[in-house]
Amino acid sequence: MAHKKAGGSTRNGRDSNPKYLGVKRYGGEFVKAGTIIIRQRGTKTHPGVNVGCGKDHTLFALKDGTVKFHTGGALNRKFVSIEE
């Protein structure tokens, strides 16, 4: 009786696609309204003046201007702002 036992399932058989997170426009760069500045998971960097935050925590420019990174607030958080 030639039988083959069922193979066990593997735990490693997957490889997720890259998410392309990170800073897209750096400090000092001129951006137009709607330009994505940072793609991130959670608010590692918070939106400052003239910067909006999407539902996936993407930070984007609300007005044309120059990107500026800075820290501040009571908890010394990282912020990104747009200077007109």
Swiss-Prot record:
GO biological process: translation
GO molecular function: structural constituent of ribosome
Region (Disordered): 1-20
Presence of keyword Cytoplasm: no
HAMAP family: Ribosomal_bL27 (MF_00539)
Family statement drawn from the similarity comment of this UniProt entry: Belongs to the bacterial ribosomal protein bL27 family.
Protein name (database record): Large ribosomal subunit protein bL27
Origin species: Francisella tularensis subsp. tularensis (strain SCHU S4 / Schu 4)
